[in-house]
Amino acid sequence: MDVARPLTVLVPSLDGPVLEALARTSRPVTGREAHRLAGAGSESGVRLVLARLVEHGLVNATQAGKATLYVANREHIAWPLVEGLVNLRRELFARMGKLIAAWSSPPATVTVFGSAARGDGGLDSDLGVLVVRPAGGEEV
Protein backbone atom coordinates (compact mmCIF):
# COMPACT_ATOMS: atom_id res chain seq x y z
CA MET A 1 0.00 0.00 0.00
CA ASP A 2 1.21 3.50 -0.79
CA VAL A 3 1.04 5.20 2.63
CA ALA A 4 2.07 8.53 1.09
CA ARG A 5 -0.86 8.59 -1.36
CA PRO A 6 -3.42 6.14 0.00
CA LEU A 7 -6.15 7.13 -2.46
CA THR A 8 -4.11 5.55 -5.28
CA VAL A 9 -5.26 2.16 -3.98
CA LEU A 10 -8.59 2.73 -5.75
CA VAL A 11 -8.09 6.01 -7.62
CA PRO A 12 -4.77 5.82 -9.52
CA SER A 13 -5.55 8.81 -11.77
CA LEU A 14 -5.02 12.53 -11.07
CA ASP A 15 -8.42 12.49 -9.34
CA GLY A 16 -6.79 10.83 -6.31
CA PRO A 17 -4.28 13.59 -5.47
CA VAL A 18 -6.91 16.27 -6.16
CA LEU A 19 -9.47 14.63 -3.87
CA GLU A 20 -6.81 14.13 -1.21
CA ALA A 21 -5.76 17.78 -1.42
CA LEU A 22 -9.36 18.94 -1.01
CA ALA A 23 -9.95 16.48 1.83
CA ARG A 24 -7.01 17.92 3.76
CA THR A 25 -8.32 21.49 3.74
CA SER A 26 -11.68 22.95 4.68
CA ARG A 27 -11.21 26.27 2.95
CA PRO A 28 -12.05 27.05 -0.68
CA VAL A 29 -9.05 26.99 -3.02
CA THR A 30 -8.41 28.15 -6.57
CA GLY A 31 -7.53 25.69 -9.30
CA ARG A 32 -3.93 26.86 -9.08
CA GLU A 33 -3.82 26.23 -5.34
CA ALA A 34 -5.52 22.84 -5.76
CA HIS A 35 -2.74 21.95 -8.23
CA ARG A 36 -0.07 23.03 -5.74
CA LEU A 37 -1.71 21.09 -2.89
CA ALA A 38 -2.18 17.98 -5.04
CA GLY A 39 1.47 18.00 -6.05
CA ALA A 40 0.68 16.07 -9.22
CA GLY A 41 -0.34 16.58 -12.83
CA SER A 42 -0.54 19.87 -14.66
CA GLU A 43 -2.60 22.85 -13.62
CA SER A 44 -4.88 22.38 -16.62
CA GLY A 45 -5.24 18.68 -15.78
CA VAL A 46 -6.23 19.54 -12.21
CA ARG A 47 -8.79 22.04 -13.52
CA LEU A 48 -10.32 19.31 -15.71
CA VAL A 49 -10.50 16.97 -12.71
CA LEU A 50 -12.10 19.72 -10.60
CA ALA A 51 -14.70 20.41 -13.30
CA ARG A 52 -15.60 16.71 -13.45
CA LEU A 53 -15.77 16.43 -9.65
CA VAL A 54 -18.05 19.50 -9.57
CA GLU A 55 -20.26 17.86 -12.19
CA HIS A 56 -20.54 14.76 -9.98
CA GLY A 57 -21.22 16.85 -6.87
CA LEU A 58 -18.14 15.79 -4.87
CA VAL A 59 -16.78 19.33 -5.11
CA ASN A 60 -18.58 22.66 -4.89
CA ALA A 61 -17.45 25.62 -7.00
CA THR A 62 -18.19 29.30 -6.45
CA GLN A 63 -17.13 32.37 -8.37
CA ALA A 64 -15.05 34.99 -6.56
CA GLY A 65 -14.46 37.73 -9.09
CA LYS A 66 -12.55 36.15 -11.97
CA ALA A 67 -11.47 33.16 -9.89
CA THR A 68 -13.34 29.93 -9.27
CA LEU A 69 -13.03 28.58 -5.74
CA TYR A 70 -13.35 24.87 -5.05
CA VAL A 71 -14.19 23.11 -1.81
CA ALA A 72 -14.97 19.50 -0.96
CA ASN A 73 -18.68 18.72 -0.64
CA ARG A 74 -18.52 16.84 2.65
CA GLU A 75 -22.30 16.35 2.51
CA HIS A 76 -22.04 14.18 -0.63
CA ILE A 77 -23.04 10.58 -0.01
CA ALA A 78 -19.68 9.35 -1.34
CA TRP A 79 -17.52 11.75 0.70
CA PRO A 80 -17.12 9.38 3.70
CA LEU A 81 -15.52 6.91 1.28
CA VAL A 82 -13.04 9.56 0.15
CA GLU A 83 -12.25 10.40 3.78
CA GLY A 84 -11.76 6.71 4.56
CA LEU A 85 -9.23 6.35 1.76
CA VAL A 86 -7.42 9.56 2.70
CA ASN A 87 -7.13 8.31 6.28
CA LEU A 88 -5.81 4.82 5.45
CA ARG A 89 -2.42 5.59 7.00
CA ARG A 90 -4.03 6.67 10.28
CA GLU A 91 -6.21 3.53 10.20
CA LEU A 92 -3.14 1.35 9.61
CA PHE A 93 -1.43 2.78 12.69
CA ALA A 94 -4.62 2.51 14.77
CA ARG A 95 -4.95 -1.18 13.88
CA MET A 96 -1.29 -1.78 14.65
CA GLY A 97 -1.85 -0.13 18.04
CA LYS A 98 -4.84 -2.37 18.79
CA LEU A 99 -2.88 -5.50 17.87
CA ILE A 100 0.09 -4.46 20.00
CA ALA A 101 -2.19 -3.55 22.93
CA ALA A 102 -3.54 -7.11 22.84
CA TRP A 103 -0.10 -8.68 23.35
CA SER A 104 0.19 -10.55 26.65
CA SER A 105 3.56 -8.89 27.30
CA PRO A 106 3.44 -5.25 26.20
CA PRO A 107 6.54 -3.79 24.57
CA ALA A 108 8.62 -1.06 26.18
CA THR A 109 8.20 0.96 23.00
CA VAL A 110 7.09 0.64 19.39
CA THR A 111 8.34 3.07 16.77
CA VAL A 112 7.48 3.39 13.11
CA PHE A 113 10.42 4.77 11.14
CA GLY A 114 11.50 5.61 7.62
CA SER A 115 9.17 6.51 4.79
CA ALA A 116 6.08 5.17 6.57
CA ALA A 117 6.73 7.50 9.51
CA ARG A 118 7.42 10.45 7.22
CA GLY A 119 4.44 9.65 5.00
CA ASP A 120 6.50 9.87 1.82
CA GLY A 121 6.95 6.25 0.79
CA GLY A 122 5.54 4.53 -2.24
CA LEU A 123 4.51 1.07 -3.34
CA ASP A 124 8.13 -0.11 -3.14
CA SER A 125 8.55 1.10 0.44
CA ASP A 126 8.50 -1.22 3.38
CA LEU A 127 6.90 -0.54 6.74
CA GLY A 128 9.73 0.02 9.23
CA VAL A 129 8.68 -0.91 12.76
CA LEU A 130 11.03 -1.15 15.75
CA VAL A 131 9.68 -3.09 18.73
CA VAL A 132 11.66 -2.86 21.97
CA ARG A 133 10.72 -5.48 24.51
CA PRO A 134 11.12 -4.75 28.22
CA ALA A 135 14.26 -6.10 29.90
CA GLY A 136 13.64 -9.71 30.83
CA GLY A 137 10.48 -9.85 28.69
CA GLU A 138 9.49 -12.91 26.71
CA GLU A 139 10.69 -13.30 23.13
CA VAL A 140 8.35 -12.83 20.21
Predicted regions and their residues:
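Catalytic metal-binding acidic patch
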Residues: 114-139
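Helical scaffold of the NTase/Pol beta-like nucleotidyltransferase catalytic core
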Residues: 1-110
